[in-house]
Amino acid sequence: MAAVSDIPVHLPKLLALFKTVVPKLVNNKHKGQYGRIGVIGGSLEYTGAPYFAAISSIRVGADLAHVFCHSNASAIIKSYSPDLIVHPVLDCVDAVERIAPWLERLHVVVIGPGLGREPGILKTASNVLKLCMDTKKPVVIDADGLFLLNDNLNLICGQPNVILTPNVMEFQRLFGEDDQAARQKMSLLGAGVTVLEKGANDKIYLPHCNEVHSMPSGGSGRRCGGQGDLLSGSLATFFSWSLQSGEPNPALVAACASSYFVKKLNAAAFQKFGRSLLASDMVNQIPSVFQTEFENSDPQ
């Protein structure tokens, strides 16, 4: 294999580039044009994950967020926020048929937050993923969505506009612990698949060209449940904007921006709450951190 190029991300350049991707707020747009995001996930045990993914997607600026969850989780997720559209369908026998018409309207779909490991639900999620691949729907795959790929990586090989967001352990389960073997396996993914490996220093892999873009460290020493869901949700919105803007490297730009953004959220919340920091505290930092880091000086 060709040598891997490890490219440190130049933050000033990234921030300047992403500001051109963020859509300007104008009065002649209608609801939905700034982003319609779907989240496939949510079970009785895991209701927070899909909520955090969906709420972060609209907090950063998408107009609408849909959560497609198990019926047992629906009322709980609805109680967290009236701003989310919740569909209790994942355990229905005709779940895919019910979800399909909504998929046509969505810009990006996040598969995995709070999905759980129930075989029937995993099968439904797998079929939804296949439908997304068949229709070339951009997807972000996280958490239990990555579990689906452990033995079925071919589901996404050669597909366009796919971003995986594994943590270190999920990355090793997908691609192995040996660096060379992992690069070899990733090379089969194709040019349309991007891998964002989360860690102290996030890494964004472009397997087709043997590039690894390394993000600087950031955030704090406090790790709390839900932070990865904030990343997948904000990433989905950033991805939709990058695609709509015509940016030539939409997945790379969105992945770098979301990695940087979530670490900034963590740092801002840690300043206020320290060891007591929770994911909900990070959600509350989204408006101020986004304004400081990404907002154009002239919103009009």
Curated annotation (Swiss-Prot):
Residue span, YjeF C-terminal domain: 14-293
Protein name from the UniProt record: ATP-dependent (S)-NAD(P)H-hydrate dehydratase
Leader sequence residues: none
Keywords tagged on the record: ATP-binding, Lyase, NAD, NADP, Nucleotide-binding, Phosphoprotein
GO molecular function: ATP binding; ATP-dependent NAD(P)H-hydrate dehydratase activity
E.C. no: 4.2.1.93
Residue numbers binding (6S)-NADPHX: G114, N167, V168, M169, E170, F171, Q172, R173, D229
Names of the cofactor(s): Mg(2+)
Presence of the UniProt keyword Phosphoprotein in the record: yes
Gene name as annotated: Naxd
Organism: Drosophila melanogaster (Fruit fly)
